[in-house]
Amino acid sequence: MKLSRIIEGLEYISNAKLDTLDEVEIEGIAYDSRLASENQIFVAIEGETVDGHDYIDKAYERGCRVFVVNRNIKLPEDSVKLLVSCSRSALSKMSNNFFDRPSEKIKVIGVTGTKGKTTISNYLKSVLDESGMNTGVIGTNGIFYNDYEGKTVNTTPESYEIHKTIRKMVDAGVECVAMEVSSGGLMMQRVNDVNFDIGIYTNLSPDHIGPKEHPTFEDYRYCKSQLFKLCKYGIINLDDENSDYMIENADCEIKTFSIEKESDLKATNITLTRSEDSLGAEFDYIEKGETPIHTSISSPGEFSIYNALAVISTCECLDLDKEKYLGALSKAKVDGRVEVLPVLPYATVVVDYAHNGMSLENVLKTLLQYKPNRMICLFGSVGGRTAIRRKELGEVAAELCDVSILTTDNPDDEDPMQIINDIAECFHNSKSEVIKIVDRAEAIQKALEIATDGDMVVIAGKGHEKYQYVNGERVFYDEKGEVINAAARILKKNN
């Protein structure tokens, strides 16, 4: 593709003449010098710990001769320099152009909020697929479409990877993609040039605030709101206290859903259900001026109802067959989200991704409605993040749990025991028994060993993840595998 076509719409200052830009043939875009090669554009991005401008010489050695920079630095004479105000924004626009604006050729649904993004995105894939709309997913659990499964490093990948993935989906016959849109992805302008048809807002709590993420809650909230400047339709949880802010800052048509307030789509008559391998809920929902409709889902709690309402609202926007999408929604499940593992015949074991105070509180309060004999909860907190998350997790467990097993989550380069001790500070006036075990596998073994008839064991924090970050390295770790193996050892010993 000609360079002039790739940089179409980009504001820049260049050392090259216009006819030169028309003549240069480009085969790819690189933003990592290790992946750079001949006939590629190298985009120098200033990251949190690494500055791409420091690796321009490496990209040059690997054959790059076109460089996008946001500092007026000196380059070799045979190089084309494109000076821009923001290289991240430039990468987004160029990636969109390079892959021939793929998001204009597919329905794109963006999901943002502190919690619910993964569940809603995966619900949408299940429901839309069964409704006859071939759908893909980009998010925390990975990239999925047709028979393809791929991994993602970030919840919302870099803009080049997004447009590349959507291009592949379009070429593979995918008609719709549900994408998790994180505040970081919005802040780092990864989705600037994605053509969103629908944006969904779930909720907001003071998470992802700290030196490595958002400096303030106001910045976090602002970044979330930017999705609704990129959409045709916005679907908003009206019960969330920040919903008015999202609506006021939106540039799109808004539809609302709720359980408490009057909205375009409201749930009523909620009841919990239970089977051997599933916890769920039934409810009625009412569209303005319509007759109530009864439906069910295979996940418990109000937060699951909110997720379901977001999916129903989306299906209505897409004008899908009600019978098909409600039938699919009733069966939909998400890996590692309030997932019951039927490993002990006398106790209920649940694995969940809850890793902040708001999520853990929602999960525990929902599960307590099933009136377990004891609530045993295993959890930890990540390293390198604001300490407030540890406090919030600890306070929730101190209030709601009979036994709290504090262990390792993703300690990164922090001392795991220090993180555990920080959480333990919240239990001074609590009736909850506290057990500290650094090794997460050993902690799981302990949690299942102490479980007795009617107890509920919640293993929180990892869910679907197959890794831990320890000492700056990503190491393999399979939460569900550890639970299954621990239970097998216990049952073998008991027999």
Model segments located where?
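Acidic, Mg2+-coordinating active-site environments of NTP-dependent enzymes
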Residues: 9-10, 74-78, 172, 187, ...
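N-terminal leader/targeting and accessory segments in enzymes
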Residues: 1-93, 229, 263, 269-270, ...
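Glycine/threonine-rich flexible loop motifs
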Residues: 49, 53-55, 188, 210-216, ...
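Phosphate-binding loop of NTP-binding sites
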Residues: 10, 91-238, 242-253, 309, ...
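ATP-dependent carboxylate-amine ligase
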Residues: 1-12, 38-41, 122, 251, ...
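Short, hydrophobic beta-strand segments that form beta-sheet elements in well-ordered domains
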Residues: 26-31, 63-70, 178-179, 233-238, ...
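Short glycine-rich anion-binding loops that position phosphate/pyrophosphate groups of nucleotides
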Residues: 47-49, 73, 183-184, 205-207, ...
